[in-house]
Amino acid sequence: MELMFAEWEDGERFSFEDSDRFEEDSLCSFISEAESLCQNWRGWRKQSAGPNSPTGGGGGGGSGGTRMRDGLVIPLVELSAKQVAFHIPFEVVEKVYPPVPEQLQLRIAFWSFPENEEDIRLYSCLANGSADEFQRGDQLFRMRAVKDPLQIGFHLSATVVPPQMVPPKGAYNVAVMFDRCRVTSCSCTCGAGAKWCTHVVALCLFRIHNASAVCLRAPVSESLSRLQRDQLQKFAQYLISELPQQILPTAQRLLDELLSSQSTAINTVCGAPDPTAGPSASDQSTWYLDESTLTDNIKKTLHKFCGPSPVVFSDVNSMYLSSTEPPAAAEWACLLRPLRGREPEGVWNLLSIVREMFKRRDSNAAPLLEILTVELAQDLLANPPDLKVEPPPAKGKKNKVSTSRQTWVATNTLTKAAFLLTVLSERPEHHNLAFRVGMFALELQRPPASTKALEVKLAYQESEVATLLKKIPLGPSEMSTVRCRAEELREGTLCDYRPVLPLMLASFIFDVLCAPVVSPTGSRPPSRNWNNEMPGDEELGFEAAVAALGMKTTVSEAEHPLLCEGTRREKGDLALALMITYKDDQARLKKILDKLLDRESQTHKPQTLSSFYSSSRPATASQRSPSKHGGPSAPGALQPLTSGSAGPAQPGSVAGAGPGPTEGFTEKNVPESSPHSPCEGLPPEAALTPRPEGKVPSRLALGSRGGYNGRGWGSPGRPKKKHTGMASIDSSAPETTSDSSPTLSRRPLRGGWAPTSWGRGQDSDSISSSSSDSLGSSSSSGSRRASASGGARAKTVEVGRYKGRRPESHAPHVPNQPSEAAAHFYFELAKTVLIKAGGNSSTSIFTHPSSSGGHQGPHRNLHLCAFEIGLYALGLHNFVSPNWLSRTYSSHVSWITGQAMEIGSAALTILVECWDGHLTPPEVASLADRASRARDSNMVRAAAELALSCLPHAHALNPNEIQRALVQCKEQDNLMLEKACMAVEEAAKGGGVYPEVLFEVAHQWFWLYEQTAGGSSTAREGATSCSASGIRAAGEAGRGLPEGRGGPGTEPVTVAAAAVTAATVVPVISVGSSLYPGPGLGHGHSPGLHPYTALQPHLPCSPQYLTHPAHPAHPMPHMPRPAVFPVASSAYPQGVHPAFLGAQYPYSVTPPSLAATAVSFPVPSMAPITVHPYHTEPGLPLPTSVALSSVHPASTFPAIQGASLPALTTQPSPLVSGGFPPPEEETHSQPVNPHSLHHLHAAYRVGMLALEMLGRRAHNDHPNNFSRSPPYTDDVKWLLGLAAKLGVNYVHQFCVGAAKGVLSPFVLQEIVMETLQRLSPAHAHNHLRAPAFHQLVQRCQQAYMQYIHHRLIHLTPADYDDFVNAIRSARSAFCLTPMGMMQFNDILQNLKRSKQTKELWQRVSLEMTTFSP
């Protein structure tokens, strides 16, 4: 036994405090635990050994006689008393004859108290689990809280009064019994769970250091023996009278027993017990050990070590500063701690205490060791280790080598290799042999371990071998071997795919070939020898290490979770070393991240990654990511696509429609090996030409961001499919097809957003085939063919998603797939990289970092690396969290946004490209809002681009976020505001956008119109009366007639345009393609196409010359058309642009130029005209037939250049009998800017869409249904003025929309009256006969009926005046129609028969008699 502890002491000289910490887990493990849980018995021994320590000198610790002054000789009496007190029980001393003098007995009692405070420390720590109670007791002793100490024989008592407490409530009575320099028992009235409480420690320390201040008395039995009989009787009576309540019952019981005639125990035993005289001679003197408390603490320690208990966080700080580890990470750390840091710490400290007790000859050593043994055995039986191995093979099958046997062979081999390395490295002549042994161990191939514990042990042993190998100096032969292995790693010939990757070997090779001369510890690596190095060693080592980062394992995480966890950690350590070494080399950092984040087999790659690492100068135009707007660039100026990143888009293009394939092309015209980039720039004039009012670009037109979508978890070696460039954005495709990201659909699909379009259980090929990996691509060539009908992709989203498994609860069964453990690991790695860069991962959570240009914080390159790794981890986390789109808070998102604010515009530019699949639209909008307040103009610009990028998901944003995003775009330039407005409008097509938001967008369009047209600022007021009849004609001629959108295979559309004169505006009647089919359309476009018409293959040209058929250029067949075109107001008009149609709503808002209202009137014969293309191209068929009605035979239309519309000299007669008269004023030769006219039409179009949304929402908005001035009143009136500015047809269309969108009868009546005033008050009756006005008036009357019925139910006498005024207004509305008064009289009769009071009816009757319309 002595030999065993001697060996232990030689090898383990220090406690756990001096051993290796494991990522500070032990220091933080009890932050949130209960106070009763033991603290691993830390601090049981003073760190600096002093004269009072057991290992120090042999002196004592007391000041009352223990420390003698130098030069004084200790009396023999004191020496003898001290030895007697330590070795002989006091009972034996009492029986000595002749009796020992009382003074000598007092000295024996004095020396019987322990004199070393380290003993008090040890047993206090042992009882409480830490040295906290001892430290508090020491503070009480130093603050003189011990009062009235008294030692009677071997009993010490005192009163402890803490300074902050008031006696007698805060006074604690403490009693300590001791014998032979050991405390045998202690008690206190504080009620603490452990007997060795703070107050007991304070009293013991007081007795040790101030022994002379303690009143010393002989034992009670000795004092009583000196009393006479009357003195004894007096003593007993006085004692009872002092404490009658406590002592009297006990005293009477004892008297009864003494006076009893029977033989009681008190009468048969000689003598009497004396608590102050110490224990009997037969009792063994031992230190007081609270075994029950100690046993409970050991149980808690073992339970926490074997299975972490759930922790409940009760405050926000705990939620921020701690994150729950996934099971694989927690289990790995739990199994690795005993190997690296002697865990469980508490058990190891208890064993150290046992060793110290044996050293002190403490008799409690054996009982403590017994308690430990029993508890460990019971815990082992209660939680047996998983020692299962693979089942035996079935009969008839070939026996294979047991995995368990191979694992044990591997671990034994590594153990022996580590031992041989330690021994052989001691002598220089054996260094080569040691190197060969170490390399053999690192190159050892093995299968996955049979148990989890062995898996962790093997990984630890490999790291130990690598550490020992790095300490051996290398010669030329060793360096040659290292270079050979590095070359094999770089070429990929060292190992094929295997479960355990040689990452430790790669780490050693990198350390040998590339490690800096001065290591982080300040010393030169022993393996580095400049004499043996060659010029290409560093590059070779770097490429080998990077190749090792890209290696893939062949096992899945579901089968071997800890092996995958260990592989990730080894890759993380290697990548961290690489990034720190090459933190100033941007090209190498890019290679490291490409391999670490697996960008070759996934779509998680930025387009211009290297430009994001600008350290000092602000980002220039070339450094920013593909801009959604900017200056023009030369067409065809492409950067070739590389394997690391996709080529950047050229700024200046609005839609990115270059010579590559566009949306309407058939598959045969687009070869899969097309070399064209999908983002070639447009000519400079593309941004200035007008655009069709019915065409709103999708996400593709706003700039592709397909670069960072980390969703394609494909096979590592599988070649990627060629993509066809731009995705088809035809209206028949589902919503996800038009997006540039496959991860986020623009509207919910079957009850929620689908974050992915593939399942985690799919194989690598099927997964990677549905991902996009090129800039601007939203689907692969295979999926694009399948999505022509619009259902294939939606089916993939729902059916092939999870393969019947719950994604959040299962590890992937396919190798190298995302998992919760992988996401957690990359988050931790990102935080570690940030700390290495000089930043603090926690500061970004609570503070708003400065966004100034001159950033003096962390190393910029490493900071960007940490940001990208964190973003990648967030993508992994979202992949395994199907409900991530509905989250309200995420600490990971807070970290990402905080780092983005610290980094600046570079991080925001990365997010512009890749936030889909990582952040939700509200999170992006919030970040963009925060970044817009920065002082750096580049960051403000990037924030505006980020805000623009989230507007296509406006249905997921609240009005404040959309409003702020619009303001950000408006602060930059008009082009960005225009894109923002189009994005919100496109998002509103599927519903979910508030009408207030759309009205705001309409106002922004009108503001743009004013900026381009130079008109008066009447954005929020009613527009002036419409007298410029040439506006619409010029807009149609300059823009090209609006047309329907068709996908591949759809038939062309034939559009009929009505003639526009200075006097009369005839409603335009648009006929669908089903009535007037035309020839097929050509698909060839030149780079100089109009940026809006280029996206519309079914009408690729704009009419430039409109001539009479007397001078035909290209005669076209003309089909006869009916004279009357009735169009029901509730049905879809034929020829309406599909972008305006909501699939699930019965009403659609379209400009009047696309459809006619239901007016029956004779239409004159229409002569066919010819259309000349805006851009001539040989062989381009022109299927479009435009008919003009009521054109004088002698009149011709001159060439329209898009700048002005000349005066029309013809003045035909009105076409409609009794129809609308011409306006009072005529405007001739009014110049019109087509670009500004586009803005005006867009404002009207969005306003009508807002009116439609208002109708959808109004049915559930009861408080505003019948309000006199609902919030939307001003916006609706403003839209009426805008419609009047455009023309009568637009007013008619507005009336139809207002009848369905407005429910307030008061607002409807105001609209009716204002409409009549704007058109022509003198011909009000003619206007009222129009179907649109008639429908609006009828809706107003119905609303009044509903209002009256509603108010009668909830009417109170206080509301009578308001109700009577409403009746008066209703009568004015009913007077507008011939049958209206009859309906109004019926209402009054119903009101008369109602249950209301007579007073109400009298007031209504009086009002009706005095009514004068």
Swiss-Prot record:
- Give the signal peptide as a residue range, or say none if absent: none
Biased-composition ranges for Polar residues?
A: 604-625, 729-744
Q: Could you mention a single GO BP entry for this protein?
A: proteasome-mediated ubiquitin-dependent protein catabolic process
Q: Where is the composition biased (Gly residues)?
A: 55-65, 704-715
Sorted alphabetically, the Gene Ontology cellular component annotations on this record are: Cul2-RING ubiquitin ligase complex; Cul3-RING ubiquitin ligase complex; cytosol
The UniProt regions of compositional bias labelled Low complexity, in chain numbering, are 759-794
The UniProt entry, under InterPro entries, shows:
Znf_SWIM, ZSWIM4-8_C
Zinc fingers, SWIM-type, are found at 172-208
Q: In which pathway does it act?
A: Protein modification; protein ubiquitination
According to the UniProt entry, its GO molecular function terms are: ubiquitin-like ligase-substrate adaptor activity; zinc ion binding
Q: Which residue intervals make up region (Disordered)? A: 45-65, 600-817
Q: How does it assemble?
A: Component of the SCF-like E3 ubiquitin-protein ligase complex which contains CUL3, RBX1, ELOB, ELOC and ZSWIM8. Interacts with DAB1.
- Function noted in UniProt: Substrate recognition component of a SCF-like E3 ubiquitin-protein ligase complex that promotes target-directed microRNA degradation (TDMD), a process that mediates degradation of microRNAs (miRNAs). The SCF-like E3 ubiquitin-protein ligase complex acts by catalyzing ubiquitination and subsequent degradation of AGO proteins (AGO1, AGO2, AGO3 and/or AGO4), thereby exposing miRNAs for degradation. Specifically recognizes and binds AGO proteins when they are engaged with a TDMD target.
What is the official name of this protein in its record? Zinc finger SWIM domain-containing protein 8
User: What organism does the UniProt record list as the source?
Assistant: Bos taurus
At the highest ranks, the source species' classification is:
Eukaryota, Metazoa, Chordata, Craniata, Vertebrata
- Gene (name only): ZSWIM8
